[in-house]
Amino acid sequence: MQLWVGLGNPGPQYALHRHNVGFMALDTIAEVHNFGPVQKKFQGWLQEGRIGTEKVLLLKPATFMNESGRSVGEAMRFYKLGMDALVVFHDELDLAPFKVKVKQGGGTAGHNGLRSIDKHLGPDFLRVRLGIGHPGHKDRVTGHVLGNFAKSEQDDLVDMLGAIASEAALLAKGDNVLFMNNIALRQQTAG
């Protein structure tokens, strides 16, 4: 069993923020792979399903970004999962918009959701980094991250989310390189 976590902030006012792209990814995966109904558990929203041959739990912490680790830690302990079962989808400033990279472990790069998970569980988890691009100057980062995707970005966002969901079976079976490559190819074809 794997636990896939999407990072974001709860509430409709945050739904289209770049910071919520982790939530968006999980919503798309759940829809494409016909996951079960949403259950309120572990201080978040949980859905159960299968991706390929793997049982996968999708968790969107409802704790706000800065406390995501509480929710994730609770689920990990309940299901007695090791760190190798955890995959976290999050926004990444240091990647070009709509690029997808998978990384094992590492630092938090100032991301409060990652920092919270690291604090509660340690840094050794798989991250699916979803590029939102950098606004160019550090003074503009907060507004960029907490801003909505622009209308002009919607097609690229939908393409990225669809590619992630379509290729999710590769991620579930641990073929991270092919997962990334196939997403990039789908995006080239769509663009």
Curated annotation (Swiss-Prot):
Residues annotated for tRNA binding in this entry: Y14, F64, N66, N112
EC number of this enzyme: 3.1.1.29
Domain of life: Bacteria
UniProt-listed Pfam families: Pept_tRNA_hydro
Enzyme active site: H19 (proton acceptor)
CDD domains cross-referenced by the UniProt entry: PTH (cd00462)
Keyword rRNA processing included in the entry's annotation: no
Role summary: Hydrolyzes ribosome-free peptidyl-tRNAs (with 1 or more amino acids incorporated), which drop off the ribosome during protein synthesis, or as a result of ribosome stalling. Catalyzes the release of premature peptidyl moieties from peptidyl-tRNA molecules trapped in stalled 50S ribosomal subunits, and thus maintains levels of free tRNAs and 50S ribosomes.
Protein name per the record: Peptidyl-tRNA hydrolase
Organism: Novosphingobium aromaticivorans (strain ATCC 700278 / DSM 12444 / CCUG 56034 / CIP 105152 / NBRC 16084 / F199)
